[in-house]
Structures are given as structure tokens and as C-alpha cells.
């Protein structure tokens, strides 16, 4: 009898875990804004998102238990954003992995880079509603140039390093040539 109870308990625990694996629902017509680069703004991104968006859902990558290398905020545009209608669905994505060089090179080269996989997430508690895997291939890694690369091209970047310092063999992503 004890064995049966243990088996049932284990089965229920595993079923509960798989039930939490869900995609993040991104509404049709959502405007995506993708920022990559230095981690300097990471500490105030949540404040920025909640000041510009309503009904904000915070999302993180599952790459680190403490400080995510990718984060995103999904919500609707609040009043007061010039040129954006109130209620427009917006997904703001920030990639910090790789630091400043990923705020310069992929933007200048229009290169796809790894980002959050919104179809491979787990519901969480705390500051982030979802923890997600990543998708895509960074420049300089085999398969990056493939049409099947699911990474995204950043819309803009941030760097706290002088872009002129991104020269071979230092400060380039995965051995890419200097700009």
C-alpha cells in the first residue's frame, strides 16, 4: 500500500511540473522592441516597463537562478507615449548576455542573436511570471547564418564600452571581425 501511495504521489508531482510548461501568450499585433547589450540598465527595466505599460507581465530566461541574462516585459502602452496608441500591445525584450559588444556589433551588422523562447516557458512565482528557455544562435557560432536561426535582430543596443575598442582579437563576439 505504501508503494502505491508513493507511486501516485510521484506521478502527481511530475504531472504538476509538466502542467506548468506553457507558452507565453503574445497577442496578435504586438509590437516587439528588442534591446541588447550592457547590463547597466537591467536594475531599472522593471520600473521603466511599469511606467510605460499597463498590465505588465515580467518574463525571464532560465539561464541563471539569480540574475537572468535575458528578460522581457509584456503589456499595453500607457497614456503619454508619443506616437503610440494607448493599449497597443508591446513586448520589450532585453538581452544582457555577452555585455556591451552585443549592444554594438549585432545592431551594426543586423545579425540575429539568441533571445527568449516564448514558446518554451514555465510559470513561476515572484518578480517574474514566467521562466523561459532561449532560442537562436549567436554570430560566430556554427549555424548562425542558417535561415532556420530563430534568433532576433536587436532594434537598438547599449554599451558602456567605447565602440572603437571592439577590435580583434578582444571585445568581439565569438571571434567575429571588427566593425
Regions found by a protein language model. Give the residues of each.
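N-terminal segment of the mature folded domain
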Residues: 22-179
Amino acid at each position: 500500500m505504501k508503494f502505491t501511495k508513493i507511486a501516485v504521489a510521484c506521478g502527481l508531482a511530475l504531472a504538476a511540473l509538466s502542467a506548468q510548461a506553457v507558452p507565453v501568450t503574445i497577442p496578435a499585433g504586438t509590437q516587439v522592441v528588442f534591446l541588447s547589450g550592457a547590463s547597466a540598465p537591467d536594475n531599472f527595466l522593471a520600473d521603466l516597463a511599469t511606467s510605460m505599460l499597463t498590465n505588465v507581465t515580467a518574463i525571464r530566461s532560465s539561464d541563471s537562478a539569480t540574475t537572468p541574462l535575458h528578460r522581457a516585459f509584456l503589456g499595453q502602452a500607457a497614456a503619454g507615449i508619443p506616437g503610440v496608441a494607448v493599449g497597443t500591445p508591446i513586448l520589450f525584450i532585453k538581452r544582457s548576455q555577452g555585455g556591451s559588444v552585443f549592444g554594438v556589433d549585432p545592431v551594426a551588422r543586423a545579425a540575429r542573436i539568441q533571445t527568449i523562447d516564448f514558446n518554451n516557458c514555465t510559470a513561476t512565482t515572484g518578480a517574474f511570471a514566467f521562466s523561459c528557455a532561449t532560442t537562436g544562435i549567436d554570430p560566430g557560432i556554427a549555424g548562425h547564418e542558417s535561415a532556420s536561426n530563430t534568433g532576433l535582430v536587436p532594434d537598438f543596443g547599449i554599451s558602456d564600452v567605447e565602440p572603437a575598442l571592439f577590435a580583434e582579437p578582444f571585445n568581439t563576439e565569438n571571434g567575429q571581425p571588427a566593425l
